[in-house]
A protein has these predicted regions:
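Structural signal for hydrophobic packing residues in well-ordered secondary-structure cores
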Residues: 20, 57-60, 132
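Soluble secreted/lumenal catalytic domains
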Residues: 19-20, 38-40, 80, 106
Length: 135
């Protein structure tokens, strides 16, 4: 038996259409690129968030799809450290809302945004609410 595909980026559009029709949850990892001391890579938040989501979705591949991670978030307080990448909160919110609206437009009625960066938290909350209101 062929395993159920769940990596959104590796699926074909007919597979995505079928996944949405099946009522699967679209899991969206979101983090940022920032410093984590002298010993860890700057994409630590992204790696950890994605790994947690991957592990969870792998347990229920027929119930969820794993969307590619959103790598950039709101991190202006880390800009003193070379390598950090931040985007403005308005840009972050517009981008995330567009991602969520795209998923809804393709038939996903349940979206789980998994946040791997503390400073994204208030914006993720608002994005979740706006997705419900605007779709």
């Amino acid at each position: 038996m062929t395993p159920t595909p769940y990596y959104y980026g590796e699926m074909t559009w007919p597979q995505i259409k079928e996944a949405a029709a099946q009522g699967r949850v679209a899991v969206v990892p979101v983090a940022t690129i920032e410093d984590h001391g002298l010993h860890l890579p700057i994409d630590t938040d992204v790696r950890l968030c994605y790994a947690a989501c991957d592990g969870a979705v792998a347990l229920v591949p027929d119930k969820a799809v794993l969307v590619p991670p959103v790598n950039h978030g709101y991190s202006p307080h880390h800009m003193d450290f070379p390598g950090a990448i931040t985007i403005g909160w308005e840009t972050f919110m517009r981008y995330m809302l567009d991602v969520c609206k795209s998923l809804v437009a393709h038939g996903f009625h349940r979206i789980l945004i998994v946040n791997g960066h503390g400073s994204n938290t208030p914006f993720v909350d608002i994005i979740s609410r706006l997705t419900v209101v605007e779709t």
